[in-house]
Amino acid sequence: MAKKRILSGMRPTGPLHLGNLHGALANWKEMQDKYECFFFIADWHALTTDYDATEPIRGHILDVFLDWLSVGLSPEKCTLFVQSYVKEHAELFLLLSMITPLPWLERNPTYKEQIAELKNRDLSNFGFLGYPVLQAADIIMYKANGVPVGIDQAPHVELTREIARRFNHFYGDVFPIPETILTESSKILGMDRRKMSKSYNNAIFLSDSPEVIQNKVGQMIYRPQRARRADPGNPDICNVFSFHQLYSDRETAEGIDAECREAKIGCVECKKMMAANLVKALDPIREKRSFYETRPDTVRAIIEDGNQKARAVARQTMEEVRAAVKI
């Protein structure tokens, strides 16, 4: 029995961080052993908000690929590619835009949220409004059976389903209707207790050196009410302890929990222990990244091979689409 096909992507915004690891990447790594997976770098999507700052995008593409390889995504198990290399995405996006009602895009909750969040940017362009149509083209191009996303992206997949149904209604059953595979969002917060994000300048990156990690952990905001060493702490609301739960062994985490509540351990010592365990956990990822950083030709070959595999599938799909639309 053929494996179900999965597709997901990431915008190239720079090196990836722990939030990416415990959100998408951990799920992708498991999925590559169970499904036929297509994972792509959505560089065209980056233009919807960064159309006036495109210079870093090519470098960011390489950063993301290095991080993908370093965490264990394997080109032997999945297809890794760059969206803009597969020009068929643009053609399918154009055709889908012809049949997508404008109100579908205007009522998209993610669109409204991003307009509010990025209120200092001029986003009054079709590319930003039509972002979900390009996303639909990305997904149905590969006839994906499922799309792993966090709850915030679920409306986009639902819109993709509606667009696929509408295309099939007009032109025949060309596309399967993809299912939403809800994945658990990362619970890791940034150093300032907000969502970990490059834009907030609060992220710990997978490529950070041990010294940088130790420095960032030292800056972490914990519970400000614990003003004195003798004050008991509350691990339940402590950002540092949430990292212990992920990166320290169970015995250590339980010991930290008890000692913090009884004020037997201070925050500085707690942070140092956590930083050491985090550095140790990320060592294999950093080592693998270093391996690929010194072999740029190998990385370029992996990217090119994935691009070719993806485009072969896309060409076949577009032949079917053109025949169905009769153009």
Where are each of the predicted segments found?
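Short helix-capping/linker segments at secondary-structure and domain boundaries
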Residues: 102-106, 141-146, 248-256, 286
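N-terminal Rossmann-like or analogous alpha/beta NTP/dinucleotide-binding catalytic cores
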Residues: 3-137, 286, 290
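Conserved nucleotide- and phosphate/pyrophosphate-binding catalytic cores
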Residues: 18-20, 155, 161-327
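Residue-level signal for well-ordered alpha-helical scaffold segments within enzymatic catalytic domains
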Residues: 30, 70-71, 98, 139, ...
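A short, charged/proline- and glycine-enriched loop
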Residues: 1-4, 297
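A generic structural motif
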Residues: 12, 147-148, 202
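Classical nucleotidyltransferase
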Residues: 91-93, 103, 107-116, 120-170, ...
